[in-house]
Each structure stands twice: as C-alpha cells, then as structure tokens.
C-alpha cells in the first residue's frame, strides 16, 4: 500500500 491518509485504498 501507499502512505496516504485515506479510509480505503
């Protein structure tokens, strides 16, 4: 996964 502030990815 990528380092992001998303609830779903």
Curated annotation (Swiss-Prot):
UniProt keyword Ribosomal protein present: no
Biological process according to GO: neuropeptide signaling pathway
Cellular localisation: Secreted
GO cellular component terms, A-Z: extracellular region
Residue numbers carrying Phenylalanine amide: 9
Keywords noted in UniProt: Amidation, Neuropeptide, Secreted
Protein name stated in the entry: Peptide tyrosine phenylalanine
């Amino acid at each position: 996964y990528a380092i992001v502030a998303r609830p779903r990815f």
